[in-house]
A protein has these predicted regions:
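Serine-hydrolase catalytic machinery in alpha/beta-hydrolase-like enzymes
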Residues: 1-123
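Short alpha-helix in the alpha/beta-hydrolase fold that links the catalytic acid
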Residues: 18-21, 174-177, 200-209
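A conserved short beta-strand
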Residues: 126, 149-166
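Gly/Ala-rich beta-loop-alpha elbow adjacent to hydrolase catalytic centers
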Residues: 128-137
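Acidic catalytic loop of the alpha/beta-hydrolase fold
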Residues: 168-170, 195-202, 224-226
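Short beta-strand/loop motif that positions the catalytic acidic residue
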Residues: 185-186, 191-194
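Catalytic histidine neighborhood in serine/cysteine hydrolases
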Residues: 211-228
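Post-His helix in hydrolase/transferase enzymes
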Residues: 229-243
Length: 254
């Protein structure tokens, strides 16, 4: 299976290859999976005070704000003071309600960028996203489902891996998809790699809650907003991914 890999905000191809190297080595050891790494189409500067956290330049994003002003801010700035409400959906609404700049224009261009890349570098069997990359991956999956309904185009992706994810945008890019206010569901098998110590855990769970509960699986590496690197944990995760792949192959076999 060939996976398209999307890094988090301020990531790059080279950085994401390093972050994901243990899992890549595990899954490529028996040729279960091959990986195609990309980066966001927008080159950006990291937030002030976070330069060391994201490593050296260059920095890329998939989503950028279009109207930052005195009254609005990038959602990345908002999550520095991440709220914790009763449910993941309540938390995400609180996060996005006040003064967050719009990102629909950049997200629309990013979808065009991804579809062009899929045509040139694909086909791909699965998609893998970390943090902001998971948001865009989920958005792309829902957009593929909408195109199938409206235009009869079959989706390319058959499964997804989400690391430290956030809920997707609607296919029309006018807001987030939250399970307590939308019937939209990501209908391919998904594996959600979360850390129970992640300060943004509610973002992870809000994404999980808009996936098909019959084919969505949570894998907890028990750390923070990071990718698992411990050898035993990576081996266990590799086996989980292989199980998802076998289920997908069984579903799509002749």
């Amino acid at each position: 299976m060939k996976f398209l890999c999307l890094p988090g905000a301020y990531g790059s191809i080279d950085k994401f290859k390093v972050q994901l190297a243990p899992l890549v080595q595990e899954l490529e050891s028996d040729q279960s999976v091959s990986f195609h790494f990309i980066q966001g189409p927008y080159e950006v500067a990291p937030p002030i005070g976070y330069e060391d956290f994201f490593g050296g330049p260059p920095y890329y994003r998939f989503i950028v704000p279009s109207d930052v002003s005195e009254d609005t801010t990038d959602v990345i700035e908002r999550i520095r003071d991440f709220p914790q409400l009763e449910t993941p959906e309540m938390t995400m609404r609180e996060l996005m309600t006040y003064g967050v700049a719009k990102t629909d224009d950049s997200a629309r261009r990013t979808l065009d960028y991804l579809y062009d890349l899929m045509n040139k570098e694909g086909p791909f069997d699965g998609i893998l996203g970390y943090s902001e990359g998971a948001t865009i991956a989920g958005t792309l999956l829902l957009h593929e489902q909408m195109r199938e309904e409206l235009e009869g185009r079959p989706p390319m992706f058959k499964c997804a891996l989400f690391f430290g994810g956030w809920p997707p945008m609607t296919p029309t890019l006018d807001g987030l998809v939250l399970s307590d206010e939308s019937d939209l569901t990501i209908n391919v098998p998904t594996t959600h790699i979360i850390g129970s110590l992640d300060p943004y855990l509610h973002g992870n769970l809000a994404l999980y809650n808009v996936c098909d509960p019959d084919t969505a699986f949570i894998f907890d590496h028990a750390k923070g907003h990071t990718l698992p690197r411990d050898k035993g944990m990576v081996k266990e995760l590799g086996d989980t991914v292989r199980q998802m792949i076998e289920e997908v192959k069984g579903t799509h076999s002749p």
